[in-house]
Design a protein with these regions (language model features):
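Extreme N-terminal, non-catalytic leader segments
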Residues: 1-12, 34
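Conserved catalytic network of the ASCE P-loop NTPase/AAA+ motor domain
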Residues: 5, 31, 49-52, 94-97, ...
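Alpha/beta-hydrolase-fold catalytic nucleophile elbow
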Residues: 15, 42, 128
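Conserved glycine(s) of the Walker
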Residues: 16, 21
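N-terminal phosphate/diphosphate-binding loop that engages ATP/GTP or pyrophosphate donors
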Residues: 24-73
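Flexible beta-alpha connector loops of hexameric P-loop NTPases
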Residues: 56, 75-82
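ATP-dependent NMP and nucleoside kinases share a basic, alpha-helical "lid"
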Residues: 63-73, 87-128
């Protein structure tokens, strides 16, 4: 009798100081690992030419972002250079439930927030 074993996905968080190469490493991991999905952040910053909502970011206004914080919809969030950024919990949970691993390219403060909110499925790598 063949039984398929379901594995819940893992969160792989790469964090580093600016310029240490985490984005380059993330791109290479995504290229090599077909089961790996990049986390998509929500942001209040304006959309840049060529960016797609739901692919590059989830673009929301500041009011909606604040409501999302109040509803505890983020695994992590921060204000950076006047704009808000955050990782929507629902998107990540849905992806993990499908058995897909989720890659995060975030700073160490975001990593700490995720560790506090969802520690069981978390693998962290700090790049120097």
């Amino acid at each position: 009798m063949d039984r398929e074993i379901f594995r819940r996905g893992l969160m792989l968080v790469l964090s580093s100081p600016s310029g240490a190469g985490k984005t380059s490493i993330s791109r290479e991991l995504l290229r090599r690992e077909p089961g790996l999905t990049m986390s998509i952040s929500a942001t209040t910053r304006p959309r840049r030419p060529g960016e797609t909502d739901g692919h590059d970011y989830f673009f929301v206004d500041a009011t909606e972002f604040g409501l999302m914080i109040n509803r505890d919809e983020f695994l992590e969030h921060a204000k950076v250079f006047g704009n808000y950024y955050g990782t929507p919990r629902g998107y990540v949970e849905e992806t993990l439930q499908k058995g897909q691993d989720v890659l995060f390219d975030i700073d160490w403060q975001g990593t700490q927030q995720i560790r506090e909110r969802l520690p069981a499925d978390l693998v962290t790598v700090f790049i120097l």
